[in-house]
């Protein structure tokens, strides 16, 4: 894919239909390089389906998705990853049967964790993996199985493995789900550090404090439609939109 100036991501009247049900109904969106966008809304609003279409996991019923100047409708997820579109999931990524270091090594070499890591890695690759773990304060857990490390560490590893190849855009699905308030604070700081590196971030989140602290723009979806696109300040002042968001099992702390 060719690199172009302008928006990093564009969605033009994107829709996903399951029979008569419109899971996503004509959503249009333009994301500039370096922006951080938070998406909220009730369960079933279409947020994850929207993410799945952007990342190539779910075919688009109508409309077009453009990434870095190229139409990507129908492009396989692994091709999008290598073009610079990284995606994490609500269920923490990584292989629990592997150590933290093995997961990081697999991401360094293969682009995503896969079984069998830790067997044929050279010294430079191991040094790179350890450097990334140190950057995310995970080096002390390098020999621990992913299943044995704390929730915050698993979230950090999820991000570290996704950004090791410096993606142009990072899609995060509920990144602070299951974290305690103090851990959310630490993850907010991590997201702000990624913003400082120029990585474009688009995330789905139910924790309002995280949404408003991290995002440049807040989008709210409801019944498959985009009903709000504005600043965090505008979102907090819009009582109608907030009522939709707060009705979605949202955590405010």
Predicted regions and their residues:
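Catalytic Walker B motif of ABC-type/P-loop ATPase nucleotide-binding domains
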Residues: 170-174
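Helix-to-loop junction immediately C-terminal to a conserved catalytic motif
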Residues: 55
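A short, surface-exposed alpha-helical micro-motif characterized by mixed small hydrophobic
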Residues: 211-213
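The feature captures the beta-strand-to-loop junction immediately N-terminal to the Walker
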Residues: 40-42
């Amino acid at each position: 894919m060719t690199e172009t100036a302008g928006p990093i991501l564009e969605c033009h009247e994107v829709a996903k239909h399951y029979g008569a049900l419109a899971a996503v109904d004509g959503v249009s969106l333009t994301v500039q390089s370096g922006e951080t966008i938070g998406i909220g809304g009730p369960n079933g609003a279409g947020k994850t389906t929207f993410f799945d279409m952007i990342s190539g996991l779910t075919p688009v019923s109508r409309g077009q998705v453009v990434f870095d100047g190229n139409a990507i409708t129908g492009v396989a997820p692994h091709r999008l990853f290598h073009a610079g579109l990284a995606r994490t999931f609500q269920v923490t990524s990584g292989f629990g049967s592997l150590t933290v270091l093995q997961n990081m090594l697999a991401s360094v070499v293969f682009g995503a964790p896969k079984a069998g890591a830790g067997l044929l890695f050279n010294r430079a690759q191991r040094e790179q993996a350890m450097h990334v773990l140190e950057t995310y304060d995970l080096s002390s857990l390098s020999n621990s199985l992913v299943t044995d490390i704390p929730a915050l560490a698993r979230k950090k590893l999820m991000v570290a493995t996704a950004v090791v190849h410096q993606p142009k855009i990072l899609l995060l699905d509920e990144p602070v789900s299951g974290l305690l308030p103090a851990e959310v604070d630490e993850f907010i700081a991590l997201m702000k550090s990624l913003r400082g590196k120029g990585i474009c971030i688009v995330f789905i989140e139910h924790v309002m404090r995280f949404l408003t602290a991290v995002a440049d723009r807040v989008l709210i979806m409801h019944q498959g439609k985009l009903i709000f696109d504005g600043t965090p300040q505008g979102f907090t002042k819009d009582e109608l939109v907030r009522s939709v968001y707060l009705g979605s099992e949202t955590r405010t702390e």
